[in-house]
Amino acid sequence: MRLLWLLATVVALTSAGILKDAPKKRYENFRVYKLTIQNEFQLAVIEKIAELSEKYNIWKDYDEHTKQLDIMVSPEELKHFQNLIMFNNIGSELMIENVQERIDEEQVTATADDATFGWTKYYELEEIEAWLDQIVDAYPTVTEKFIVGESYEGRTIQGIKISHKTGNPGIFIESNIHAREWITSASATWFINQLLTSQDAEVRNLAESYDWHIVPVFNVDGFVHSHEKDRMWRKTRQPHATNACIGADANRNFNSHWLENNGASSNPCSETFAGDTPESEPEAKALAEYLTTNKEKFNVYISFHSYGQYLLSPYGHTKEEFPENYADILTIGKAFADAIEGLPYGTVYQYGSTADVLYVASGSSVDWVFNELDKKIGYTIEYRDKGRYGFILPPVQIIPNCEELMVGMRALIEKTKELGYL
């Protein structure tokens, strides 16, 4: 009982802000390895050490097709980790030698050009929200802000609607549900800007033929924490009464096959913790309520993530079943991937159901929209790269990534319309 009381006290103090003055977490000499897993025992060994110790962090879950996963290792555990993988005959490739160096490189030095919002650096929440205000002021006849709801820490979850005419079919984009995936909100704001300012005929047609509902930063609390305290933070920020670990994976917290088939974790310290109950996180509950209320306003749902270069579709909770319209879903996915691969960058995207192409993930927003709101076209876009930088994608890659997004989205929407879903 005393242990439970102490844990609850720590959580309460943290929630009250007493412990929030802790210094920003540094990742000096933390390494990221890509491991090649040959059997279930090896996988269990790696997943167990990651779940039991905060000195390990799985960046990219096990992919059954490549037989690989990415894991970050603290310098204190490095020798033990190297012995462990050698003893268990697990293949490894060093992807990042010093995570903190990558983080430091990501922080672009301010220049005179930074007086205006752009896409050569990553921005904090207040800067993104201020830019949204400027956009609405600059384009009052075709834009309006909307509020999805409120986060645990009391921040508003803001979005922008772009609409050129009444009666357009709608597309909803949710971004940065995982806090550390900064490329997602950067891509969302770039996409908004292009819809409003581009003079390209195909982009103008895309902008004016559909209503766009875009939430650049969904996990607002986690996003702020990732900027101010811990660059590698993923989850929400709601504490738990009986555990010192904070937050849940909001993308495992939706009430669609919640916690099924090991597609999430019941451990509050896990990065894929599903929450205490479905929609236990205020953010997930708010989005579910908002989308339910406004379900007639959109036909397609897209969720921005990183990393790995995938276009993932339902189902996430099982690879034994597929949606009735899976052939159409794959046709659209191929159009997206082919369009991106046709660019000079040569970036390759895999496409298919989450569970089949990548891993089982239950309780995701895309699956919830598909199953509960009957929206039959929904995708998770996992942006660059394949692991060389992972979540810490250099700012110089923001615009190339966004260019891939635009050609991919144009192809995706065109094929979706051709097949009769828009």
Predicted regions and their residues:
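M14 metallocarboxypeptidase catalytic domain recognition
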Residues: 2-7, 12-422
